[in-house]
UniProtKB/Swiss-Prot annotation:
Similarity section: Belongs to the CheD family.
Pfam families: CheD
Listed name of the protein: Chemoreceptor glutamine deamidase CheD
Known EC number: 3.5.1.44
Null mutant phenotype: Cells exhibit poorly methylated receptors, are tumbly and have a decreased sensitivity to attractants.
Subunit structure as annotated in this protein's UniProt entry: Forms a complex with CheC.
Species of provenance: Bacillus subtilis (strain 168)
Alphabetical UniProt keywords: Chemotaxis, Hydrolase
Functional note: Deamidates 'Gln-593' and 'Gln-594' of the chemoreceptor McpA. In addition, deamidates other chemoreceptors, including McpB and McpC. CheD-mediated MCP (methyl-accepting chemotaxis proteins) deamidation is required for productive communication of the conformational signals of the chemoreceptors to the CheA kinase. CheD is absolutely required for a behavioral response mediated by McpC but is not required for the response to asparagine mediated by McpB. CheD is necessary for the generation of wild-type prestimulus CheA autophosphorylation levels. Also required for methylation of MCPs by CheR.
Reaction equations catalysed: L-glutaminyl-[protein] + H2O = L-glutamyl-[protein] + NH4(+)
GO biological process: chemotaxis
The keyword Hydrolase is assigned to this record: yes
One function term, GO molecular function aspect: protein-glutamine glutaminase activity
Length: 166
């Protein structure tokens, strides 16, 4: 009889990966970036994407990293989850990050990357009719998040506020 040991799947910046129970999925370094988890509770499967920027139209490279931008990352994560056996109608979302790590004297909204990332992700989730179950966004602290596909709990660690689960 073989037993498989749970693995923590690490998601880098501008990266997306899928995890199935018993594994968990984690990303760190969420400042203005947003960690978006899409999951199918019944399938005990989740995708985590580490979004850096709100809009891919500003990309100056020919080869687009679809995980990097909110407007392409949501679709990419959905596609990966469906390929992994999840059902689009069953997908739910949790998100964390989108901090304003540095305060600028400018009133220019272009400098507010964190809030713009959160807004862009919410717009995409709305387009796909995916409900946001919970979020921990904004503020001025960086975050590390880890999601458990079986319990659907998102554990959040910050330096200033400590730990919480949503």
């Amino acid at each position: 009889m073989s037993t498989t040991e749970a693995v923590v799947i690490k998601v880098g910046i501008a990266d997306v990966k899928i995890a199935r129970f018993p594994d968990t999925i984690r990303t760190s370094g969420l400042g203005s970036c947003v960690g978006l988890v899409l999951y199918d509770k019944e399938k005990q499967t989740a995708g985590l994407v580490h979004v850096m920027l709100p809009d891919s139209t500003l990309s100056k490279t020919a080869e687009l990293n679809r995980a990097k931008y909110a407007d392409t990352a949501v679709q990419t994560t959905i596609d990966m989850l469906i390929e992994a056996g999840c059902r689009k109608f069953a997908l739910k979302a949790k998100l964390a990050g989108g901090s304003e790590m540095f305060k600028f004297k400018s009133t220019n909204d272009l400098m507010k990357i964190g809030p713009r990332n959160v807004l862009a992700i919410k717009e995409q989730l709305s387009l796909f009719n995916i409900p946001i179950i919970s979020e921990d966004t904004g503020g001025s602290s960086g975050r590390t998040i880890e999601f458990e596909p079986k319990s659907c709990m998102l554990h959040i660690r910050t330096v200033k506020q400590g730990e919480k689960t949503i």
